[in-house]
């Protein structure tokens, strides 16, 4: 009887380990596939002081969110607009709002060790120096300690793409989030969000949620 119990336990542990490994492999695969989307987004300049830059980022992000099944709305203010995107899973579920910003600070291009802050590159640290690699290096298992260099890669375009990638992984497993999703996208955070207080007062219904999480860097 004890031997049978031991066999069952060992089999269960093996099944759990195999399942975890499978999930990790799929997540990593989808993460690598999402790099193209991140690279495309990072290639759009997003200087918070440049309205033309911001307009292009608003257009790109809303189009992408629509592709992922979100309903988007532009919240106009006396400053630049915000975007609120909603994905309703079930009316009975709570709604979690995620605040993030997609603008970036102005840059001194001469201080960047690459052609442009808006031409993303892959680098690896070797002998205390960052060496630029080919983008295919991302798929090489031997190159796990590499970084993507571009303006706003971590603060804050990276988390935006990470969230969309996570939703894509859930779709692969035919799973749904356990809550309704609302995204609040600020395009002036790097200049103290002048339109945010006005939007909060003016669009209370659009911004209403049961919980708010701030995604400001991965």
Task: List the predicted regions and their residue ranges.
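Bacterial Sec-dependent N-terminal signal peptides
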Residues: 1-22
